[in-house]
Structures are given as structure tokens and as C-alpha cells.
């Protein structure tokens, strides 16, 4: 039997939680291959937010071209869908230049959008929702649950008869599409599985994960202290002085920024700022690791191993070289 031809990945994805050493590994790869780095970090897109986001320095960015860093103002928003569009265009452009796209970051929703796509379910329809609400006011949610059971018994069976929000959404989807929500979700799950299979071939996904989470937690504390010493409060104060930003914006909700903002508002003291900032970073890290563990196509490297960069490089070399 003839072996299947070797196909190099379209791009390499270097994933990992906060403080796992992604930047150092990416720059080491840039010294071995002609890479261009595509940032996959929802905080690095913002201009004037350098310290609290641990943005690569100018010297680090000079080692290899970097993309999707400093592309929007903190007043603006940037979505996972926009990232997927931008990243796909960059991948094609970088490959056309004969270089290797290296996607680096820990914003796993962005990774999902790039490799699996986002939900195609219809959005909310105000008119249909108002119609359903009127029926519920007249007949009660148990009556609407009974209606749902007639058209989508699978969904109705897992919902309580007074679960207004979910009953409303299931009926809304049925009235919008003529199909039960259970069937729509099953189709989406099948599509996601297909996309995961495709992603395994199209992308080499390497995950930097800690064998000992306590060591990563110590790194997080050291890193946050370094940010405070490096001028995080001055950076946030400069953002406050603009006068058009507030803690409700996605940019200011970034870990570290919302805590520093609260401190400058006089809501918390310095000890609480540090405690909350470190705790929020650890929670972010936990969520990132949970996402990673639901990514079966990833190749895991212990980010605490002394030779973790060499392990990453070995995986990349094996994927790029024709057997």
C-alpha cells in the first residue's frame, strides 16, 4: 500500500495559558524558521495597553514580523469572528511570501473561531420573542413547554416546564427555521467534529501546559508584581485621563486593568488590587487550561520542562519536513 503523501500544516498554533512561556518559545522558533507571528490574544489588539497585557517589546517584535497587535483603540471592540477573518487572510498572505504563519496566544474562543467556525444558529428575533412572551403571559410557561414538546420532544424533555429563557429560545428557533433546536444543535455538533478533523490536518497545534500548576501560579504572582513595578498604574491612569473609557468596555475589563481602575477609583487598596489581580489571572489560566483539554488535536508540551522550547521546535520540524 502506498503511504499517504506528507502534507505540511498551513500554520503552526502555539497555545497555552497565561505565563506559560509562549512568547519565548515563539521567538525561539523565529530564530530557526522564517516565521511571521499572528497574535491570538484578545488583549494585545489594543493600543496604549502594553504593561498589563505583557505585550511583546519592540525589540521582541523586531525579531519577526508580528500581526494583530496594536490594531484598535481601547474604545473599540474586536470579535472572535473578526479575528478568524483577519487570521485567515494573514495566513494566506504569509504563505504567499514563502514564510511560516505562527499563531501565538491563549484566547481559545479565537482559536475555535479560526479552526471550527462559530455558531450558525439564527440570532434573536425581537418580534417572535414578543409573540412568545405574549403567549406565556396569557397561557403560562408550562403551556408553552407543552407546545415545545409537540415539535421538539428531545429539547422539551431536558427543560423544566418553567425554564422561560430556554423554552423561549427553543420555540424561537423552531419558528425561525421550521426545525427543532435538538436537530440544529446535533448538526452543529457534527460540523464541529468535521472542522476539528480538518483542523488537525491544516494546523499543527502545540499546547504549553504545566505539569505542576502551583509553579505556574507562582509565575503569575511574580508576573503581576513585575507589572505593578513596571508602571501598570501609570498606564491605567493615562487611559482614565482620556475621559471616554470606562470599566464596562472589553478593553478595561481585561485582567489587571479592571482591578487597577478600581484602585484608582478608591474602591480597593493596593493589597486588594494585588490579591484580586493575581486571583483573576489564575482564574483566566484555569479557563484556558480547561479549553485546551477539550482540544483533542493539540500536541502537549510541559511548559515547565527545561527543554520545552526544544520540544516545541522538534514538533514543528517533524511537521514541516517531508519524511
Swiss-Prot record:
Residues 41-44, 165-169, 253-258, 286-293 are annotated as: Interaction with substrate tRNA. The gene is miaA. Catalyzes the transfer of a dimethylallyl group onto the adenine at position 37 in tRNAs that read codons beginning with uridine, leading to the formation of N6-(dimethylallyl)adenosine (i(6)A). This is tRNA dimethylallyltransferase. The record marks 107, 129 as: Interaction with substrate tRNA. It comes from the Bacteria. Monomer. It catalyses: adenosine(37) in tRNA + dimethylallyl diphosphate = N(6)-dimethylallyladenosine(37) in tRNA + diphosphate. PANTHER family: TRNA DIMETHYLALLYLTRANSFERASE. Its cofactor is Mg(2+). Gene3D superfamilies: 1.10.20.140, P-loop containing nucleotide triphosphate hydrolases. Belongs to the IPP transferase family. One of its GO terms (molecular function) is ATP binding. It is an enzyme of class 2 (transferase). ATP binds at residues 16-23. Keywords: ATP-binding, Magnesium, Nucleotide-binding, Transferase, tRNA processing. It comes from Ralstonia nicotianae (strain ATCC BAA-1114 / GMI1000) (Ralstonia solanacearum). GO terms for biological process: tRNA modification. Its EC number is 2.5.1.75.
Amino acid at each position: 500500500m502506498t503511504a499517504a503523501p506528507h502534507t505540511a500544516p498551513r500554520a503552526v498554533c502555539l497555545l497555552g495559558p497565561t505565563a506559560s512561556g509562549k512568547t519565548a518559545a515563539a521567538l525561539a522558533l523565529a530564530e530557526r524558521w522564517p516565521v511571521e507571528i499572528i497574535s491570538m490574544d484578545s488583549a494585545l489588539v489594543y493600543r496604549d495597553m502594553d504593561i498589563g497585557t505583557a505585550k511583546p517589546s519592540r525589540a521582541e517584535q523586531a525579531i519577526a514580523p508580528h500581526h494583530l497587535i496594536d490594531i484598535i483603540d481601547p474604545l473599540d471592540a474586536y470579535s472572535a469572528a473578526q479575528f478568524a477573518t483577519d487570521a485567515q487572510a494573514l495566513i494566506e498572505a504569509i504563505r504567499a511570501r514563502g514564510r511560516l504563519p505562527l499563531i501565538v496566544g491563549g484566547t481559545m474562543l479565537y482559536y475555535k473561531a479560526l479552526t471550527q467556525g462559530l455558531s450558525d444558529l439564527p440570532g434573536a428575533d425581537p418580534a417572535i420573542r414578543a409573540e412568545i412572551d405574549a403567549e406565556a403571559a396569557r397561557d403560562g410557561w408550562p403551556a408553552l413547554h407543552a407546545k415545545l414538546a409537540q415539535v421538539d420532544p428531545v429539547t422539551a424533555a431536558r427543560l423544566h416546564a418553567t425554564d422561560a429563557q430556554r423554552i423561549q429560545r427553543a420555540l424561537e428557533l423552531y419558528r425561525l427555521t421550521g426545525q427543532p433546536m435538538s436537530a440544529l444543535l446535533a448538526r452543529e455538533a457534527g460540523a464541529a467534529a468535521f472542522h476539528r478533523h480538518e483542523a488537525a490536518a491544516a494546523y499543527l497545534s502545540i499546547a504549553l501546559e504545566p505539569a505542576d500548576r502551583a509553579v505556574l501560579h507562582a509565575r503569575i504572582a511574580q508576573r503581576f508584581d513585575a507589572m505593578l513595578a513596571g508602571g501598570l498604574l501609570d498606564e491605567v491612569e493615562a487611559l482614565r485621563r482620556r475621559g471616554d473609557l470606562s470599566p464596562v468596555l472589553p478593553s478595561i475589563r481585561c485582567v489587571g486593568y479592571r482591578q487597577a481602575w478600581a484602585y484608582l477609583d478608591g474602591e480597593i487598596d493596593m493589597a486588594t488590587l494585588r490579591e484580586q489581580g493575581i486571583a483573576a489571572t489564575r482564574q483566566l489560566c484555569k479557563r484556558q487550561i480547561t479549553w485546551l483539554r477539550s482540544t483533542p488535536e493539540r500536541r502537549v508540551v510541559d511548559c515547565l520542562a527545561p527543554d520545552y522550547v526544544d520540544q516545541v521546535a522538534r514538533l514543528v520540524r517533524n511537521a514541516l519536513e517531508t519524511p
